[in-house]
Amino acid sequence: KRVMLERDILASTNHPFIVTMYRAMQTKDRLYFFLQYCPGGEFFRMLRRQPKKRIPESYAKFYASEILLAIEYLHLLGFIYRDLKPENILVHMSGHLMLADFGLARCQTSSGKDGKPLQGVSPGIQRRKNRSKKSGFEVPRLSNGRASNIVSGGRNRTNRSGNCFSRLCGGGSHVLGEDSPVVDTESQLDSQNGANRAMSFVGTVEYIAPEVIENKGYAGSVDWWTFGILLFEMLHGTTPFKGKDTDDTFANIYLGDFEFPRSIQTSEECKDLLRLLLAKEMKDRLTSPHIIRDHPFFHGVNWALLRNQKPPIIPEVRHPLDTRNFRSFKD
C-alpha cells in the first residue's frame, strides 16, 4: 500500500526541488520506479563531509529555502511528507537539493487526493499583532484565531504545464495585505475537526514531533517540526533533542528544551525561527509556509529565481552517471 501511494505521489508532482519519476513499471512481484538520477548523493553525506559536519548559516538558509518550497508544494497537493531528514534529500549535479523517498508520506484523502490542489479560501483575515512569547516576529492570524497560511492570489499553483516554479514561488518578498486571499493549508490538511488526522507512529527518532509521541493525531504540522530539526542539524551538526537512547530522545522531545551551543555563532533571526518551528504545541507552532518565508531569517531570498542561483556547495561529479557520492553496497 505504501509503495503504491509513493508511486501516486511521484506521478502527481512536478517541482524543481522534488525528484522526478519518469516512469513506473510493475511485474508480477516487483514495482520499478525510473527516477531522476542525482549524482551528488545524499544531502546527509554532503553535510558529514563538511568541517565539524555543519555548514554556515548563509548556506543553511539557501538549502532550507529549497526544502521549504518543496514541502509547501506537497501540502498544497494534500500530501504530508512525514520523514524529512538529510538522508531523504538528494543532491542534483548542479548542487540543488531534491526531496526524495516518499515511503512514509500520507495523502489527506478529504482534500487533495490524487494530487488535486487544496481548495478553500478563508472567509476573512483579521489583522492582529500576535507575538510569540519568545519572539518579536508578528504572526498574522485568521478571524478564527489560527495562524494563517497566506499566499498571493491569482496564480495557478499546481499547473503542470510551463514553468510551475515561478507560479509556485511568486516574486521576491510578499506583503501581507488586507485583501490578500488566504489558503490555510494546515486547516485543509487537518479538516473535519481533526477526524482525518494521521495517527501512525512513523518517522525517524530524532525528528519525531511531540504530537506523534503523544499519539494525539497530526497533519501538516509534523513537517514544519522536522523542517526546524533539519535547519538546526545543518547549523550545528547534530539534532537538538538527541539523547543517549530512544527513550531519552523521546523524553527530550516531549518535555525538554533545546539550547543553542555557545561555540557556534547563530543569528537572533535564526534562533527566533527555530523557536517558532520547534514549539511543542501544534497551536503555537509556525505552520504557514508563506509566513515562514516572510520571517526575517529568510530576508534577501529571491524565491522566484532560487533554482537559477548557484548553490553554496557543488558536488564533485565527473560524469552524469558518477556514483562516487553514494555509499557502496556489497552483495
Regions found by a protein language model. Give the residues of each.
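Activation segment signature within eukaryotic-like protein kinase domains
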Residues: 63-64
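A conserved loop-to-beta-strand element in the N-lobe of protein kinase catalytic cores
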Residues: 28-36, 44-45
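Conserved N-lobe beta3->alphaC-helix segment of eukaryotic protein kinase catalytic domains
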Residues: 1-14
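A short, aromatic-enriched beta-strand patch in the conserved N-lobe beta-sheet
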Residues: 23-24
